[in-house]
């Protein structure tokens, strides 16, 4: 009996000194919004217009409604009992389907997409927009988000290999629609991005993010392949992913991440490099 009591005492001592597992983020679907919730998120949740739009090429200087946007519908396929795995199916007006498997962890959300063109004709779906709203995260009231630029100093991307806060050098102000800012990777034609002001500088990688209102946390996101990085007009940030058009019968895989992590930039970059080795070669 004494031996058993000793074992039990040791077990409880270990339990006391071991940190509790960090609770997972959870997912919900509310209208066209993907909602990420967790006590670790400033403001308690992130809301994402998911997806805001599927887009055609030739979009940089084109009418957003009459040319660029391809209409689509979105269907909730399933949500796991623990609200950690959510599956969606998007159907584009031209017949393309996109299956989404979205998985929440303690400090990230993982996106795995399969786009397929079952039709006899080539699809014009070239890129798409997940629009992440960041008012609460950056310490502002969502009611004041319209065309707000007060959050810009909280936001960053990477230029010449260094974290660069917004507004970046050579901030553009002219475009079909203003305000906002677009950064186009070297691999993407500059004619095929958002019709907002296009910055002449090329980002060093595909990571874009911001610091929380108290500077203790970072939100960041990346996709592969990616079409653009974008600072929008309602306190939003985008890494918009590329489809590149799908031939008849073609299937493509796309993946993405949202990170919600402590404000350790070096640790974030190491994790990003592991998740997206294509971006750091």
For the regions a language model picked out, list residue spans one by one.
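Beta-strand-rich recognition/accessory modules
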Residues: 21, 78-80, 89-91, 179-281
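Acidic-aromatic substrate-binding/catalytic surfaces of carbohydrate-active enzymes
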Residues: 21-76, 84-85
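Extended, loop-rich substrate-binding clefts of extracytoplasmic carbohydrate-active enzymes
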Residues: 58-106, 124-126
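Positively charged n-region of N-terminal signal peptides that target proteins for export
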Residues: 1-5
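Acidic (Asp/Glu-rich), glycine- and aromatic
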Residues: 104-160
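Low-complexity, serine/threonine/proline-enriched polar segments
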Residues: 147-193
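Bacterial N-terminal signal peptides
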Residues: 6-16
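Residue-level recognition of well-ordered beta-strand positions that form the cores
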Residues: 89, 101, 112-116, 131, ...
């Amino acid at each position: 009996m004494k031996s058993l009591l000793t074992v039990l005492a040791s077990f409880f001592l270990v339990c006391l000194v071991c940190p509790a597992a960090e609770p997972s983020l959870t997912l919900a679907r509310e209208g066209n919004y993907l909602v990420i919730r967790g006590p670790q998120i400033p403001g308690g949740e992130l809301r994402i217009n998911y997806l805001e739009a599927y887009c055609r090429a030739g979009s940089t200087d084109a009418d957003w409604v009459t040319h660029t946007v391809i209409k689509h519908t979105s269907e909730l396929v399933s949500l796991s009992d623990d609200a950690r795995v959510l599956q969606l199916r998007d159907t584009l007006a031209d017949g393309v389907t996109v299956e989404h498997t979205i998985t929440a962890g303690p400090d990230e959300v993982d996106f795995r997409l399969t786009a397929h063109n079952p039709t006899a004709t080539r699809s014009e779906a070239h890129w798409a927009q997940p629009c992440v709203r960041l008012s609460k995260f950056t310490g502002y009231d969502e009611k004041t988000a319209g065309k707000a630029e007060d959050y810009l100093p909280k936001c960053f991307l990477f230029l010449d290999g260094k974290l660069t806060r917004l507004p970046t050098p050579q901030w553009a102000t002219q475009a079909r629609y203003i305000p906002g800012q677009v950064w186009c990777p070297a691999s993407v034609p500059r004619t095929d991005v958002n019709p907002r002001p296009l910055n002449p500088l090329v980002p060093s990688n595909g990571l874009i993010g911001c610091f929380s209102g108290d500077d203790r946390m970072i939100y960041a996101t990346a996709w592969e392949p990616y079409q653009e990085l974008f600072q929008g007009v309602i306190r939003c940030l985008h890494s918009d992913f590329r489809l590149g058009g799908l031939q008849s019968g073609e299937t493509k895989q796309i993946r993405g991440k949202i990170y919600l992590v402590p404000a350790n930039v070096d640790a974030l970059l190491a994790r990003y490099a592991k998740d997206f080795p294509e971006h750091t070669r």
